[in-house]
From Swiss-Prot:
Keyword Magnesium: no
Transmembrane segments: 23-43, 78-98, 112-132, 143-163, 185-205, 209-229
Entry GO terms, CC: endoplasmic reticulum membrane; Golgi membrane
Naturally occurring in which organism (per UniProt): Xenopus tropicalis
Compartments where found: Golgi apparatus membrane
Keyword match Transmembrane helix: yes
Function: Involved in the fatty acid remodeling steps of GPI-anchor maturation where the unsaturated acyl chain at sn-2 of inositol phosphate is replaced by a saturated stearoyl chain. May catalyze the second step of the fatty acid remodeling, by reacylating a lyso-GPI intermediate at sn-2 of inositol phosphate by a saturated chain. The fatty acid remodeling steps is critical for the integration of GPI-APs into lipid rafts.
The protein's name: Acyltransferase PGAP2
Cytoplasmic face residues: 1-22, 99-111, 164-184, 230-252
Annotated family: Belongs to the PGAP2 family.
Mode of membrane association: Multi-pass membrane protein
Lumenal side: 44-77, 133-142, 206-208
Broad class of enzyme this protein falls into: transferase
């Protein structure tokens, strides 16, 4: 990556603002998620809102919406597949971004690598729960979902810790804005996730009408806050370009 500037070099073959690349990558699962929810409500309402105890429910769970019926399953898998490789590239970019930030803490370099590892694990288990739906193999899908949530929480926590340790209130306006939104979205994500667990337990214990609808809505907020957290890359890479150059140009 190089800073955005008027000169791109004679050997530059392709360039793209990294903000466009990073946010566009996250937009793929966002589109797929919204499509699956809307399509399920319009065309597969009864199939995707059914509950094990047959109480009234008005929203499909995330698993039912993305993996229960077609074409939702195909759209979700296509978008997740397309966004996966770029997500790993964004992870590498973040690793270099954090490593390039001066910090006197002896634990900082290890936190950078831990953050990258957690990010890779999050992406891997997202792929697993995507391509093994709950209707195909419930146990594997459940494992993928639980691991995805665990690594997502870990990644967000370590990311916020890196910013707190390295920045300590300093940095540009964009960096301070990014850090502020990261903290808000992580807190909201954690609150919605814990709330969804409590509501899910309540549903399984008492099977009351509408409770599973609340659970599904909380799931949606968990997913959207996760995507929002990753979209803070808009501020982190605002002055960078992704460039592909011929061998004569050493910039990448």
């Amino acid at each position: 990556m190089v800073p955005v500037g008027p000169e791109r070099g004679a050997n530059s073959l392709f360039s793209l603002r990294f903000t466009t690349f990073a946010v566009g990558t996250v937009s793929l699962p966002l589109f797929a998620f919204l499509f699956c929810i809307v399509w399920s409500l319009l065309f597969n309402f009864s199939e995707t809102t059914a509950t094990h105890c047959h109480v009234p429910n008005y929203l499909p769970s995330v698993s039912a919406a993305i993996g229960g019926e077609t074409p939702q399953r195909y759209i979700w898998r296509l978008c997740i597949g397309l966004h996966s490789a770029p997500r790993f590239l964004v992870g590498v970019a973040y690793l270099h971004y954090y490593q390039g930030t001066p910090c006197s803490s002896p634990a900082y370099p290890r936190l950078c690598h831990l953050n990258f590892l957690l990010n890779c694990c999050e992406i891997f288990f997202l792929i697993l729960l995507t391509y093994v739906s709950s209707s195909e193999n419930y146990e594997v899908h459940k494992l993928g979902f639980m691991a995805f949530m665990l690594f997502s929480v870990g990644y967000m926590f370590v990311t916020c810790s890196l910013w707190r340790v390295a920045r300590k209130g300093s940095g540009s306006l964009e960096e301070r804005t990014s850090y502020a939104w990261k903290k808000r979205l992580f807190g909201f994500y954690l609150l919605m996730f814990l709330s969804s667990i409590l509501v899910y337990i309540w549903h399984n214990m008492y099977c009351e009408a509408g409770v599973y609808t609340v659970f599904a809505l909380l799931e949606y907020l968990v997913v959207l806050s996760n995507m929002g957290f990753h979209m803070t890359a808009w501020w982190d890479f605002g002055n960078k370009e992704l460039m592909i150059c011929s061998p004569g140009d050493k910039r990448i």
